[in-house]
Amino acid sequence: MPSHPLVRAFVDAVNAQDQQALWTVLAKDATVVDVGTERDPADWVERELFSSHARMEVVQESHDGLSVTARFHNDIWGDIDTAWEFSVSGPVIRGFVTGPG
């Protein structure tokens, strides 16, 4: 389980498939970069996390808890190892970068 409370809330929301919880922790104007390409956050979250039933199992994290590697599963990609780097400001995640881990 991630040690940083915002990252933990993000992972918990994904695993619970709780869109309201995710958008509580993720800034409305958050940036999402997936495999080097900036994506529309609302479209990406819906496609990659919710309509595809995503699950994340964090297997390693940085000392500050803002970078994690996770076993990720969704109905699009199946099981893949992923890396996530989160940027936070105050009570929200301002953005994240993800890709193969």
Give residue ranges: language-model regions.
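Generic helix N-cap/helix-start motif at coil->alpha-helix transitions
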Residues: P2-S3
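Surface-exposed, charged secondary-structure patches
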Residues: A42-S89, T98
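Short, well-ordered alpha-helical segments enriched in acidic and aromatic residues
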Residues: L6, A16-T31
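Amphipathic alpha-helical repeat scaffolds
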Residues: R8-D12
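Polar, enzyme-active/binding microenvironments
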Residues: V92
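Conserved short acidic donor-positioning loop in nucleotide-sugar-dependent glycosyltransferases
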Residues: V14-Q17, G36
